[in-house]
């Protein structure tokens, strides 16, 4: 099964990056641009909303939340996202930096949709990076590069 992989260096402490990924308010700041519903603690479920949608684009279950790793299992979402696993691995880098290893694993097959998702993940991870470093985020729709209708 193919996976989406990204590696990002962030000039911010692991704890700050973790907080932006592990809580629904943080996720909204760098990714969705609007509030999530549910809870992002271990075992929790949260819905991801974009634009003016009434229904979540995806529902995630938090399967890991440690200082060095956060994982979400996709329980609802676009067909090819179902049952995939999104993992953020955080490692200290230097005195105050973080290396983020991102994996969106378990895709059934490589596809044009998957490549577009990879492009957008790169943009949203850049939003996470710049937000953690400077407080300036570019969530959806500003951060979206590849549009799917």
Question: Where do the protein language model's features map onto the residues?
Answer:
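Glycine-rich portal/gate segments that line the openings of hydrophobic small-molecule binding cavities
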Residues: 37-76
């Amino acid at each position: 099964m193919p996976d989406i992989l990204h590696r990002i260096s962030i000039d911010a402490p692991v704890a700050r990056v973790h907080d932006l990924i592990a809580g629904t308010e943080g996720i909204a700041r760098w990714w969705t641009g609007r509030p999530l519903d549910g809870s992002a603690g271990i075992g929790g479920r949260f819905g991801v909303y974009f634009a003016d949608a009434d229904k979540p684009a995806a529902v995630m279950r938090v399967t890991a939340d440690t200082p060095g790793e956060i994982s979400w299992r996709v329980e609802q979402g676009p067909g090819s996202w179902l049952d995939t696993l999104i993992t953020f691995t955080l490692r200290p880098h230097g005195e105050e930096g973080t290396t983020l290893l991102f994996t969106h694993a378990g895709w059934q097959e490589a596809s044009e949709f998957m490549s577009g998702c990879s492009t957008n993940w790169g943009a949203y991870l850049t939003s996470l990076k710049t937000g953690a470093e400077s407080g300036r985020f570019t969530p959806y729709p500003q951060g979206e590069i590849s549009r799917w209708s």
